[in-house]
Structures are given as C-alpha cells and as structure tokens.
From Swiss-Prot:
NCBIfam families: mnmG_gidA. It comes from Hahella chejuensis (strain KCTC 2396). Its cofactor is FAD. It comes from the Bacteria. NAD(+) binds at residues 273-287. Belongs to the MnmG family. It is found in: Cytoplasm. NAD-binding protein involved in the addition of a carboxymethylaminomethyl (cmnm) group at the wobble position (U34) of certain tRNAs, forming tRNA-cmnm(5)s(2)U34. The gene is mnmG. SUPFAM superfamilies: FAD/NAD(P)-binding domain (SSF51905). This is tRNA uridine 5-carboxymethylaminomethyl modification enzyme MnmG. Signal peptide: none annotated. GO terms for molecular function: flavin adenine dinucleotide binding. PANTHER family: GLUCOSE INHIBITED DIVISION PROTEIN A (PTHR11806), PROTEIN MTO1 HOMOLOG, MITOCHONDRIAL (PTHR11806:SF0). Keywords: Cytoplasm, FAD, Flavoprotein, NAD, tRNA processing.
Length: 629
C-alpha cells in the first residue's frame, strides 16, 4: 500500500549521518521522514563511546554551528572532556569527550522526537521508487510505499554487512542487527561503482574483573571544556577517569600465533580497513619493531560496568581474544562481555557524487556517511547534515550549497571524497586542510552560523546567542584599541614586569596583546574589564590578535592560489627534494610530470595541501611563471 502522506525528504538510517540529515531537512521546513529498522537504536554509538578528537571535533563544532545535534547530545552525555594538543597552536587543538552510550542515545532521540516537521517510522527499506532517472520514494520490507521528492541514504555498515569472528562469519549490519540485503542488491543494479570496506571493534570488558591499581589513571581536564556553542558544564553528567595500560611481548606472541585463523590474514575479508584505526593484529604485523602498544580503557557509561578497551580492535577467534586480553596488565582476570569482531560492508565510490552529495546517476538521491567510504561518527554527522540540507533545498527547488575548502572542514571532507575518491575508510585530520589556521574549532560558529541562518537551519535562540557573542568580540576589540598605557606610569611599570622589558612608548592594550609574552590572563592584571570578559570572547580575541599576521597571510594565500592555478611547473623540477610532500605524492608527481599546478591538483592523491607546498617551493626558487595560452 501507499503511505497516506507524502514527504519532501526521506532519510534511510538512524545513525549519526541519518539523524543529522533528518534534523537538518526538518529544521529547514521540509516534511521529513526518518526511516529506521529499529527506533531503539536511533543515535547508537556502534563502536567507541567517544565524540571528537584531532580533526573530528572541528567537524562536530561545524555541525553544531549549523544547528546540528551531535555537540549538544555530547554535552548531555559526556562523562569526561579533554582538549587534545592544548599546548600547540589553536589550529590543531581539539576537544574530545568520553560519552555515556545510553545518555547519548537518549539525548539524540529526545531531540528527534521534539523536532517539528519530522516523522519517525520503524521499517527496513528494501527498494527505491524510481521515476525516470530520479528517485521518488522508498519501498519498505513489508511492501509499504513512501513517496517523496528526495531520498537520503545513510546506511552505515548495513549494506551487505558480514560480521567476522575468526574464520566464522554471518550476515549482520552490526552485532545484534540484521543487514540490508535487498537494498544492497538494488543499489548494485544501478550504475554506481561499488566496493567493500571493513571496520572492527574490540571485545568489551566487565570493569569488576579489572585491576585498575596497576593502570595509569587518565582524568579529564579542569576547567571542563564544552562541545557545543550552546552547551554548558551544567549539562554534563558525573565526570569519571579513563585508564591506560599496554600490550606486551606475550600479547604479541598470542596474536601472531592466531594469525592462521585471522579472517584478515587468510583472505576471508576482502574489504580494506581503516589505516588510522588498525586492528591489534594489524598493529603487531605492521609495527613488528614495537614491543608494546597503548590500550585506553574507556567506560561505556555511568550505569554499566562495561569497558571499551580502545586499541585492541580484533576479529581473531574468541579463544585468541580471551588469551590476548588476559595477557594485558590489569586484565589478567578480565571477563569479556562481548567478543570483538570485524564487519565488511558495501560502499560506493564518492567520485560518483556532486558536492551537494547528490548522486550523479540518480537525481534527488543523496548519500551520506559510511556508504561514501568514510569512517567515524563525526565524518558521518557532517555528511548527513550537508546531505539533509541539500535534499531539502532540492525539494524546495533551491540551489544546492556546500562549503569551500577554505570555509569548513566539511568542505575539505566532501572535496577530498568527490575529487579523489577513497580506497580505504576516510578519516578527517587537521593535516588534510591547507587553511587550518582559518578553520579552527573555536571559530566554527563565526564561520558558518550566519550561513546556517540564511539557509533556515538556525533557530532564534541560537541566533541570539551567536549575535551577542559576535557583537561582544567586536566591542571588546575596539575597546582594547582605545585604551592606551603611557610610559612611566604605574600601569606601564606593571606591564614591564609582565613583559620583562620596559615600555619606551605608549601602547594600546591591543598592541600589548600582540606581544608573544603577553597572554589574556596577564592582560587582565592591567585592566579590570579584560578580567571580566567571558571566556569565549577572550579566546577569540587572543587568537585573532596574536595570529593576525598569519591569518592575513593565509587569506592572501587563498586568493593567490586561485590566481596562480595555471602556473607552469618546470620540466626539471625535483619533487623528491620538496619538504612536506609525502613519498606517495612525490612518486605520483615524478611519474606524471604535470605541466601546471592545475594539472598537478587533478592527479588522484595529490591533495590541495600538496599543491600549496608546490606553490611555496616555486616561490622560494623563483621559478614561478604562467603557462602561455
């Protein structure tokens, strides 16, 4: 039968991509249906119980700046918060939160159920309704037909999913959930290029069987960070420690002894796994010179004894898993509550997508998340938000929008995927962005919230908070420029103590803040209003003032790179001598010998960051010249 109501947007899948896609479309006023095989698993954290990290928190903050749910849910569920790279520059600082699985899932479900214009329905999707070369709806497992203007597929690991534990395997979308076989078969009949990827998860451990006294405690940060621009520490539940232990040579012997029954090393698994989140058997094999690897013991939540041992993801047989866990210090008597496993699934070449994440072959059909070859909750959420937003724009017959590489990490993610494709699960890093000083996690709202408001994704309360912050930054910056400290005054003497050098002329507070020795905290000793400035305003001002020169140069670089795209590359250029290029990129450039920067940028695997390095190298050797027409 046909469902009595038609929709503007149908989202298939209720994971991190699907929930953000459905919420984005509904926020924009589109009648949206979220179709999930199980309402109880909406927003489920299928793998590690954490949000954020290097490169990933930048995506979370951008999703938040555009009105998404992930950061707010993390603030409601986060049981430990840390800022990674806190001693490094602001471009690479990243917030990471350990999350209570149950609280996170509950927060997402509450947000979904209270979102206007959003309908949730429990049924697996088996087929797509087609009208010519466009999708026009979805057919469920029981034959129910839902009609819509657009469809967003966020199927995660469910398409043709196969779970492996040792040499045993069975069909599954994840442990305890059935795979999507009929839909996978239907998509394979379409002209998309399909491949197989794999990911894995470690065995879960009962905390009551672990000796934490021999492990290193890893507390959260004080003061406690927040993830959302609308969040606060008051939202956080009780905070807890994580712990660190290590594998040892005995562990590695056990793993090597089980390799003959590893589905990865016996050819049973054909899919490629994530390079930057390898299984423990992969680590032991690839890094045979190391006699130990860190294992982070992470609590799964406040109301459970289960632990997530981050660092020993495995698909080895269960008897080997048992031995390797028991060989690790502090886990000699550990009880495994769930075995580790690998899952292999279909993905589709993201080069078959537009920047909007609409497919090139089927109109009004959008892909987001692991179906595009990415790995990670944060990467999925970012794609989901973009796909849901563009599906709504398509339904409203409006022009699609996607951020440029210099506007957002979301732009970097999408551009990387559709330009270069991927042969392994794609993970975001700050190193993938050539404009990372502009794309900090702390300024995601200043970069994107105004655009989000224009697109209809920002509610009045978030807009009010954003405008107040932006105005406060402008006011305080102007005030710092207007307050001067004259030499030979009491404030000048105080400033000299802080700077460890005399002031020989007058300085504004703004000028003093530019000095590397002067921090916001020190500046507050010279001016009471500085001390009273809210943290989020002070943070922006300190970064903007101290890094103004670098930021201006990066802005100029963006403009220059556009102008210099057709610059000629010398035929005798020695790519092996260019510092910063990976060996893979050096090899490709040497083989192809591109004539111009533009041609170099189109070589698969040559990143925009590498093109920027080429441009810098050419300037240094003074060999920049335009290719004649």
């Amino acid at each position: 039968m046909d469902f009595p109501k038609s929709f503007d947007v149908i989202v298939i899948g209720g994971g991190h991509a699907g929930t953000e896609a459905a919420l984005a479309a509904a926020r924009m006023g589109s009648q949206t249906l979220l179709l999930t095989h199980n309402i109880e698993t909406l927003g489920q954290m299928s793998c590690n119980p954490a949000i954020g990290g290097i490169g990933k928190s930048h995506l979370v903050k951008e999703v938040d700046a555009l009105g998404g749910a992930m950061a707010l849910a993390t603030d409601r569920a986060g049981i430990q918060f840390r800022v990674l790279n806190s001693r490094k520059g602001p471009a690479v600082r990243a917030t990471r939160a350990q999350a209570d699985r149950a609280l996170y899932k509950a927060a997402i479900r509450e947000i979904l159920e209270n979102q206007p214009n959003l309908t949730i329905f429990q049924q697996a999707a088996d087929d797509l309704i087609m009208q010519g070369d466009h999708v026009a709806g979805v057919v469920t497992q029981m034959g129910l037909r839902f009609h819509s203007k657009t469809v967003v597929l966020t199927t995660g690991t469910f398409l043709g999913g196969v779970i492996h534990i040792g040499l045993e395997n069975h069909s599954g979308g994840r442990a305890g959930d059935p795979p999507s076989i009929a839909l996978a078969k239907r998509l394979r009949e379409m002209p998309f290029r399909v491949g197989r990827l794999k990911t894995g998860t470690p065995p879960r451990i009962d905390a009551r069987s672990v000796d934490f006294s021999v492990m290193e405690a890893q507390p959260g940060d004080t003061p406690i960070p927040v993830m959302s621009f609308m969040g606060s520490v008051d939202l956080h539940p009780h905070q807890v420690n994580c712990f660190i232990t290590r594998t040892n040579e005995r562990t590695h012997e056990i793993i090597r002894g089980g390799m003959d029954r590893s589905p990865m090393y016996t050819g049973v698994i054909e899919g490629v796994g994530p390079r930057y989140c390898p299984s423990i058997e992969d680590k032991v094999n690839r890094f045979s010179d190391k006699d130990s690897h860190q294992v982070f013991i992470e609590p799964e939540g406040l109301s459970t004894h289960e632990l997530y041992p981050n660092g020993i993801s495995t698909s080895l047989p269960f008897d080997v898993q048992l031995q390797l866990v028991h060989s690790i210090q502090g886990m000699e008597n550990a009880h495994i509550t769930r075995p580790g496993y690998a899952i292999e699934y279909d993905f589709f070449n993201p080069q078959d997508l537009k920047h909007s994440l609409e497919t090139k072959f089927v109109g009004s059909l959008f892909f987001a998340g692991q179906i595009n070859g990415t790995t990670g909750y944060e990467e999925a959420a970012a794609q989901g938000l973009l796909a849901g937003m563009n599906a709504a724009l398509r339904a409203q017959e409006k022009e699609a929008w996607s951020p440029r590489r210099d506007e957002a990490y979301i732009g970097v993610l999408v551009d990387d995927l559709i330009t270069m494709g991927t042969r392994e699960p794609y993970r975001m890093f700050t190193s993938r962005a050539e404009y990372r000083l502009l794309l900090r996690e702390d300024n995601a709202d200043l970069r994107l919230t105004e655009k989000g408001r224009e697109l209809g994704m920002i509610d009045d309360e978030r807009w009010r908070v954003f405008c107040e912050k932006r105005e406060a930054i402008a006011r305080e910056q102007q005030r710092l420029k207007s307050i001067w400290i004259q030499p030979a005054t009491e404030k000048a003497r105080k400033a000299a103590e802080l700077l460890e050098t005399e002031l020989t002329r007058e300085y504004s507070l703004h000028d003093l803040l530019k000095r590397p020795e002067m921090t916001w905290e020190k500046l507050s000793l010279l001016d009471a209003d500085v001390a009273a400035t809210p943290y989020e305003v002070a943070e922006q001002l300190e970064i903007q003032v101290k890094y103004a020169g670098y930021i201006d140069r990066q802005q100029e670089e963006i403009e220059r790179l556009r102008r210099n795209e057709n610059m000629a590359l010398p035929a005798d250029l020695d790519y092996s001598g260019i510092q910063g290029l990976s060996n893979e990129i050096k090899q490709k450039l040497t083989e192809v010998r591109p004539e111009t920067l533009a041609q170099a940028s189109r070589i698969p695997g040559v990143t925009p960051a590498a093109v920027s390095l080429l441009l810098v190298h050419l300037k240094k050797r003074g060999s920049l010249q335009r290719k004649s027409a």
